[in-house]
């Protein structure tokens, strides 16, 4: 049914949900015209206008579907999944740019991959930041996030954490809340209780140019952390002008 504007809502019977993924097509009827979406990689021209008819009319099958993940209401909220050297995570350095090497570490047949970040300093007292946008993931699980109490970060359990390694969030109103990371468990999992997050300066990233512009926002008012306002996940660490800084990062989630 239509809920407003171009937004429509449907209730899917539980019996139609198989495994952890729901696949579906959308059939649009207007007058005597019926079009099916998506078209996938079919050879049709003007594929944005859909495929004529509905699947019951065709003498062939189409493997093109939209998909939606299906999870249990009390399951963890994944914030970062390492899949390749990009993995939707951005890297920055303040006060200036530094060299960065990103390498996917995926040599084990039984463990999930890690993403190695290796920063080479070019100036004095650098600070390194890793950020990824997670607002959409939070909004998809609004009810669940209210009950989450721990931020979990998987790292290489055989390597020491970088100096000043901290983790937390930037909210939609521009405030940053972080906590120093404790030592990981024997499984390589860092667990940070959300109640330990503290308001701190917000790094103004990407790096401003010219470089004499402000690089941090210093809050003057103490504002409580609200998980439902999370916009970005942020990790940060300190460096110096002589030593490489390296972190091998795995999946990150809320539970």
Task: Kindly give the residue locations of the regions a language model identified.
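Beta-rich carbohydrate-recognition modules and glycan-binding surfaces
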Residues: 64-255
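Glycan-association/targeting regions that enable binding to alpha-glucans and other polysaccharides
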Residues: 1-107
């Amino acid at each position: 049914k239509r809920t407003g504007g171009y937004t429509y809502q449907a209730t899917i019977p539980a019996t139609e949900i198989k495994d952890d993924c729901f696949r579906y097509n959308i059939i649009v009827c207007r007058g005597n015209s019926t079009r099916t979406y998506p078209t996938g990689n079919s050879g049709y021209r003007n594929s944005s206008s859909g495929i004529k008819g509905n699947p019951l009319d065709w003498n062939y099958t189409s493997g093109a579907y939209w998909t939606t993940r299906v999870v249990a209401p009390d399951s963890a909220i994944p914030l970062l999944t390492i899949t390749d050297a990009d993995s939707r995570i951005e890297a920055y350095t303040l006060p200036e740019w530094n060299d960065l090497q990103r390498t996917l570490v995926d040599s084990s047949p039984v463990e999930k991959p890690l993403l190695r970040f290796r920063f080479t300093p070019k100036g004095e007292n650098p600070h390194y930041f890793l950020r990824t946008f997670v607002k959409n993931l939070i909004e998809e699980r609004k009810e669940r996030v209210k009950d989450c109490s721990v931020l979990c970060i998987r790292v290489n359990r055989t390597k020491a954490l970088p100096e000043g390694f901290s983790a937390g969030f930037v909210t939609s109103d521009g405030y940053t809340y972080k906590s120093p990371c404790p030592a990981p468990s024997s499984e390589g999992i860092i667990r940070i209780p959300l109640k330990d997050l503290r308001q701190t300066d917000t790094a103004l990233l990407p790096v401003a140019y010219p470089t004499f512009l402000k690089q941090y926002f210093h809050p003057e008012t103490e504002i409580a952390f609200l998980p439902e306002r999370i916009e970005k996940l942020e990790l940060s660490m300190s460096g110096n002008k002589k030593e490489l800084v390296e972190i091998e990062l795995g999946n990150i989630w809320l539970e």
